[in-house]
A protein has these predicted regions:
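Bacterial Sec-dependent N-terminal signal peptides
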Residues: 1-20
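Alpha/propeptide regions of enzymes that mature by internal proteolysis
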Residues: 20-375
Length: 375
């Protein structure tokens, strides 16, 4: 009996470890390019990520995620950027100025749908309080969202400006927390618990040696596919989010960063490829989904000064014919980031006792073995 108990406990412990491992650690290798050290958006030098997670009582299941392209005054030294809209049923704040000028001037904030105005105000406060910004009278806050209203009391608008500022302050490089954290706390993906996911790719030196990093906030539906395996079909689960959320549609926010010297035009081309990565996981960009890709170049030589003594801006940018490897790296990193979010997320119960189960990792691993998809 004692021996049997030890076996059971050992099995439970092993399954727990499997659930916490990232897909790549378990032998699921997506794509052909190598990852960075952390397989995260923070593999790009200077990029930082911070989370504030709000889990309180029975119905608060939300949070904030902040992504900083570099550690400095972004209003005074802006970075090239572009935004691609896969499906525009969303409330992304700051889009039109980025589209018009091709740069961003604040950190990127992700949160829930009804907390976008709060996050915008927090970014204004953050910017106005920075040294050298004493005369600033216009700030283009960049805030993305997904609707976490099935698990979270979204109408309560529990995210505060202090939470947003805390997420920015907590932002750091290195390993990035995934799953039920920050803006991914209350999200749902393919009918399972979604969340934050991240991944990276490093091009070989012969192709420039540049790094692509992706971070996602997954809250969308479709027919789940992992590394070419039709998981939903095999499990017999064609779970669309609408079956759970009825009229409360969600989104997928995708943040792409690279140290490659790109202008806004080629960043938009890069952003479009991220949607191909989403499609490879079985995402369908449904009518009610807000699927946005924000692409940013962190190349220091191409930062854009707010105030300059010259009228000329002379960036150094890659040629068009050097873009294809970056396109492929973006697709791979986006696909893996989404899968990472599913592996990291855990079962959650929230508002009105609504429960969303984690993806059945053990069954997924069995399928990977069945189709020889493990390295």
């Amino acid at each position: 009996m004692k021996k049997l108990l030890l076996i059971i406990l050992s099995l439970i412990f092993t399954l727990s470890l499997i659930a916490k491992d990232r897909p790549r650690d378990l032998g699921i290798e997506i794509g052909v390019f190598k990852t960075g050290k952390y397989n995260a958006i923070t593999d790009i030098k200077g990029v930082k990520v911070g989370h504030v997670t709000l889990i309180e009582g029975n119905d608060i299941r939300t949070g904030v995620t902040a992504i900083l392209p570099y550690d400095g005054n972004m209003f005074q030294m802006k970075v090239p950027a572009a935004i691609h809209i896969g499906n525009g049923f969303g409330k992304l704040a700051g889009y039109s100025q980025v589209k018009e000028l091709g740069n961003i001037e604040t950190p990127i904030i992700l949160t829930n749908t009804l907390s976008v105005p709060t996050a915008c105000n927090a970014l204004i406060t953050y910017t106005l309080d920075q040294k050298e910004n004493e005369n600033v009278r216009s700030v283009n806050s960049l805030v993305g969202e997904t609707n976490d209203g099935w698990l979270n009391d979204i109408r309560g608008r529990h995210v505060t400006e202090a939470d947003v500022l805390k997420a920015i302050k907590k932002a750091k490089g290195g390993k990035v927390e995934e799953g039920n954290v920050g803006a991914g706390t209350g999200t749902i993906c393919f009918g399972y618990k979604g969340g934050i996911g991240t991944a990276s790719r490093v091009l070989p030196k012969t192709l420039g040696g540049y790094t692509i990093g992706v971070l996602v906030q997954t809250n969308f539906g479709g027919k789940l596919e992992i590394n070419g395996v039709q998981v939903a079909e095999e499990i017999g689960d064609y779970y669309y989010r609408e079956k759970i959320l009825n009229e409360a549609d969600g989104s997928c926010m995708i943040i792409v960063m690279t140290d490659a010297p790109l202008d806004a035009r080629n960043l938009e081309r890069l952003a479009k490829r991220a949607m191909l990565g989403l499609a490879k996981t079985g995402g369908i960009a449904s009518n009610g989904s807000g699927d946005y890709v924000i692409a940013v170049s962190t190349a220091e030589e191409n930062r854009i000064p707010y105030d300059s003594e010259t009228r000329l801006y002379t960036p150094s940018v890659l040629r068009n014919d050097a873009m294809s490897p970056l396109f492929m790296a973006t697709i791979e990193a986006t696909e893996e980031a989404i899968v990472n979010s599913l592996f990291a997320a855990e079962t959650m119960t929230g508002r009105d006792e609504h429960k969303v189960d984690a993806m059945p990792v053990d069954r997924v691993m069995d399928l990977m073995k069945k189709y020889n998809k493990l390295k």
